[in-house]
Amino acid sequence: MLKDFFSKKKRYATIPSERAKHDIPEGIMTKCPSCRTIMYTKELKKNLYVCDSCGFHHRMNAFDRIESLLDPGTFVELDKGMTTEDPLSFPTYREKVEADRKKTNLNEAIVTGEGTMNGFPLVIGVMDARFRMGSMGSVVGEKITRAIERAIENKQPFLLFSASGGARMQEGVLSLMQMAKTSAALERLDRVGGLFISVMTHPTTGGVSASFASLGDYNFAEPGALIGFAGRRIIEQTIREELPNDFQTAEFLLKHGQLDRVIPRSEMKDTLTKILDIHHVS
C-alpha cells in the first residue's frame, strides 16, 4: 500500500481531433513571411497581395496579375492549349508537369494574351512561378516568341512579367535554345520600332534574367524581387568574397544602373499606363 502511495500516476495528453485542427479552413488566412503578420487572404488579395503592415510583396499568380492590370473583359488568351511533350523522356518529368497542371489549372509556366490597359491595346505575358518554378522550357519560349510576333503584327506594345528559376533542366539544350530564340524575336520587335516593357518579379533568375527579361526598352522590377543569374553562394565561392546583404535585390540593381525603376504594385498600372500613353500611335 505504501508502495502504491509513492508510485507515479500515469499522465495522459489530450490529442486534438483532426476536426479541431481544421476549424479554420485552409487558405482563409495568410502569414506574411517578412513581418509574420497574419491577415485574411481575401483582404490580402484586395491589396494586390501586398502586406499592409510591412509592404512585403507576396507572389501573385498569373491571372490575378492580369485581372489587376487589364480592363475588365478585354483579355483574350493566346496559345492556351500548348503543352510540353517531354522531348528528352526525362524521368518523372511528365508526372511533375501533370501535378502542376492540377495544382495551378495552368498548362504551362506562362500565360500570354491580348487586352487593353486603361484603353491602350497591348500584348501581355505573365509568368507563374507555381508551375515548375516558372522555369523556361520549349513551350514557354514558344509562347513568348508568338506573343512578340503578335505584337509586331498588330503594331502593339509587348508587356512581360517575369517570375522564374531559369531554364528548365528536364528539357536540356532545348530549354537553353529559348534564350536565343526569344532574344531574336525581341530584336525583330525593336527593328520595327515596337515597344517592350519588362517587369521582373520575385524571383527572376538564371537563363530568364540573362535573356528576354533584361532586354526591355524599360526594365522595371517589384520591390524586394530577387534578380540574378547564378546563386549568391556560388558567386561568393567563386570570387572568395562576402557579398552585400542586399545583393541581387531589385533595389541593389537599381542602385547600380541595371534597372530603370522599382515600382510598388499599387503604382504599377498607373506607371505602365503613362508609358503606353507616351508611346501610343493613334
Curated annotation (Swiss-Prot):
It is an enzyme of class 2 (transferase). Its EC number is 2.1.3.15. It holds the Pfam family Zn_ribbon_ACC. One of its GO terms (biological process) is malonyl-CoA biosynthetic process. Keywords: ATP-binding, Cytoplasm, Fatty acid biosynthesis, Fatty acid metabolism, Lipid biosynthesis, Lipid metabolism, Metal-binding, Nucleotide-binding, Transferase, Zinc, Zinc-finger. Component of the acetyl coenzyme A carboxylase (ACC) complex. Biotin carboxylase (BC) catalyzes the carboxylation of biotin on its carrier protein (BCCP) and then the CO(2) group is transferred by the transcarboxylase to acetyl-CoA to form malonyl-CoA. This is Acetyl-coenzyme A carboxylase carboxyl transferase subunit beta. It comes from Halalkalibacterium halodurans (strain ATCC BAA-125 / DSM 18197 / FERM 7344 / JCM 9153 / C-125) (Bacillus halodurans).
